[in-house]
Amino acid sequence: MDLSRSQTNFQLGFGCSHASMTPTPTPRAPIADDSINLQVDQSFRSLPTTFSPIPLQLLEQKAEKTTTVDEPKKDGGGGGDQKEDEHFRILGHHMCLKRQRDCPLLLTQSKHPKRSSIGDSDLESRRAAVRAWGDQPIHLADPDIHELMEKEKQRQVRGIELIASENFVCRAVMEALGSHLTNKYSEGMPGARYYTGNQYIDQIENLCIERALTAFGLESDKWGVNVQPYSCTSANFAVYTGLLLPGERIMGLDSPSGGHMSHGYCTPGGKKISAASIFFESFPYKVNPQTGYIDYDKLEDKALDYRPKILICGGSSYPRDWDFARVRQIADKCGAVLMCDMAHISGLVATKECSNPFDHCDIVTSTTHKGLRGPRGGIIFYRRGPKIRKQGHHSSHCDTSTHYDLEEKINFAVFPSLQGGPHNNHIAALAIALKQVATPEYKAYIQQMKKNAQALAAALLRRKCRLVTGGTDNHLLLWDLTPMGLTGKVYEKVCEMCHITLNKTAIFGDNGTISPGGVRIGTPAMTTRGCIESDFETMADFLIKAAQITSALQREHGKSHKEFVKSLCTNKDIAELRNRVEAFALQYEMPASLIRIE
């Protein structure tokens, strides 16, 4: 290449004037002040040349490859070296590149013209691999978990479920729980989310709220509801957090008397068990040890002395109806907000099969499973609108407002104070369950559940068993085992080996001491499977037989709990009773054939 002409034909100039760089001024079009310009000498076009001027192009677009092969030497000394040169033109000059350009992309494209299709194939392969990773059924994705799930399925099918807080959900609820709604994050309340894309989630939650009010016969201008709590314990703590400062007072039914731990339970030794008792000051009221009923007179005396800011009614192991009107009077006298935890009786409340806490309470909380047959979760109802001042009300906590201010406080406590995003699959499942609560079929179910509990209580009483309060008004009963010399701990273990599930519970003894001397028995789950009064008569026989086996084993092994448990696996009486229980249970289908009997 002749480089002698390049300095006259091709020059670089700057927007600023530099006379030394351009001996012969030539016209050029300025681009911008103080910017670099490409300056071409006008005389270039008139110079004779064998090449026609061509526009500047990318090297790979105009590269012309020529191959020169050295002739083999006549002495036969091996093959000639193959050399590959590249020739191209730029600004009319013929140029030859002797050294191979380091351009892997260019060489790859020239040697592999179908590279793009190969790349697309690789991308599709990677996409398919990712999709396949998340598209396996449980038995392939995780055989270990699948095996355990199958075992739990068989346990439910082949056993008698008498735990009062358990039930079997319907098919539609199960489908919603396992749906795509679990994918969406939706922190906040409907219409005020922290994430976008929640227009349909908002509609689902609003529909759930509407159905919750309808299920319990409530007017939206008088009651509001939050359906986001993860559990009733979470719902209860949200109420405390929203309405109280740390260290302020709450008062609920003592746990051994039938209350729930989330109502502020402390052990007799003073150990704080519940977060409610850790962050707030709690003081319990109790049942009458002779009758097992709540002593409302003593409750009033204690409340007037203690002056709680929140008075809690409701429990988890109380078999009798509540006098909500009397508790309302007590709350008014001591100036407390009245809250009811109706977790165990919510189905009875919805169908008007027990006294109604909404007639008297300011706040009502509940689980969403148990009698409601919904998903596991919590719910909070709260009053809104103008307050109705009752005669004899004492405002000891400086409450002079004329309207309820519970809504904003409770909603803020649920989110962002205590929870993050709600479980949208749970809210949809709850909406389905609440729709069913408003049907005549559900009312018939609750009525049968209550009849079954009374039939079971009567059957045990005829067999000389002692029941706390002598019976039941709802879905559960408490069997005091102490007259038989048994504790709930050993008895529930024998029942479990016989495929009967129930739970031990503390009994408030006649002498004022607390011992886990009883068991709690409930009828919701087996009523769901189709059992009626006569079936619970049969179950009473199973329970009595299990108690007899427990007494015999306890006499044989004395106080050695280790030997007692060891003997359960080889006991012939247990094996015989287990076979009878399984044969009985297999007669009844699980709801909507969710779990097939095999």
Curated annotation (Swiss-Prot):
Quickly give the catalysed reaction: (6R)-5,10-methylene-5,6,7,8-tetrahydrofolate + glycine + H2O = (6S)-5,6,7,8-tetrahydrofolate + L-serine
Question: Any idea which GO molecular function terms this record carries?
Answer: glycine hydroxymethyltransferase activity; pyridoxal phosphate binding
Tell me its cofactors: pyridoxal 5'-phosphate
Kindly give the Gene3D superfamilies that the UniProt entry links to this protein: Aspartate Aminotransferase, domain 1, Type I PLP-dependent aspartate aminotransferase-like (Major domain)
Locations of Basic and acidic residues compositional bias?
61-85
Tell me which HAMAP family the record gives.
SHMT
Give the protein name, as stated in the record. Serine hydroxymethyltransferase 7
